Design a protein with these regions (language model features):
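Eukaryote-biased recognition of intrinsically disordered, low-complexity regulatory segments
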Residues: 1-23
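Short, contiguous acidic and Ser/Thr-rich linear segments
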Residues: 20-32
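Ferredoxin-type iron-sulfur electron-transfer modules in oxidoreductases and energy-metabolism complexes
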Residues: 31-50, 95-217
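Long, hydrophobic/aromatic-enriched structural stretches that serve as scaffold segments
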Residues: 49-50, 65, 69
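Short, structured protein-protein interaction patches enriched in aromatics and acidic/basic residues
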Residues: 53-65
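Glycine-rich phosphate/adenylate-binding loop and adjacent beta-alpha elements
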Residues: 70-92, 99
Length: 217
């Protein structure tokens, strides 16, 4: 099938960007979305044009490296998946797809669809860890923890820091990311001792990075 793309192109955060139109044909419905972009880039390179920059690594929805807006939706139309898990069977012949990077002050554009998410790293460095009794790792079953607690902690630990929550939030808040990291440590015995100081330190860093405030309005 034939797919029309409108992609945000920007050389860096210091220069203005613009949307550029591309056509990819043929596109197999069995391709992943990123494989379709690979095909586009192969064509651009063959024509001695600059390929579209985008992040990816595992391409299995695990690492959190990939991510951009697909028709204004973080990671695209399929719920609970990353953009690398999106497949072209989700689209139809002649569809026009608009691709943009995460839009947030705290995520400056590096190039095209690639943004700098190191602000997340600095939030973790501010307190997203345990520094108490970490000299020797105990056996996993040495500390008994209720299964329900473990499940809740694992749900929070499953956050892959992709940045989609920031992109989806009108205030560009990273409170969902920060709270996930706070929760997965605070729920477990190892993280109890520093839980209060951890929250304050991580939220202070969150605000210092320029993320917006969370709102329930």
């Amino acid at each position: 099938m034939r797919i029309l793309l409108k992609i945000w192109r920007q050389a860096s955060a210091k220069v203005p960007g613009e949307f550029v139109d591309y056509t990819v044909d043929p596109v197999s419905p069995d391709m992943s979305f990123l494989e379709m972009l690979d095909v586009l880039n192969e064509t651009l390179i063959a024509n001695k044009q600059d390929p579209v920059a985008f992040d990816s690594d595992c391409r299995e929805g695990i690492c959190g490296a990939c991510g951009f807006l697909v028709n204004g939706i973080a990671h695209g139309p399929d719920p609970g998946t990353t953009v690398c898990q999106l497949h072209m069977r989700r689209f139809s012949e002649g569809d026009r797809i608009i691709l943009e990077p995460w839009r947030a002050k705290a995520f400056p554009i590096i190039k095209d669809l690639v943004v700098d998410r190191s602000a997340f790293d600095r939030i973790i460095q501010a307190g997203g860890y345990t520094s108490v009794n970490v000299g020797g790792a105990q056996d996993a079953n040495a500390i008994l923890i209720p299964k329900a607690t473990v499940e809740k902690a694992m749900d929070s630990a499953a956050c892959i820091a992709c940045g989609a929550c920031v992109a989806a939030c009108k205030n560009a808040s990273a409170v969902l990311f920060t709270s996930a990291k706070v929760s997965h440590l605070a729920l477990l015995p190892q993280g109890q001792i520093e839980r209060r100081a951890r929250v304050v330190a991580m939220l202070d860093q969150h605000d210092a990075e320029g993320f917006g405030s969370c709102s329930n309005e």
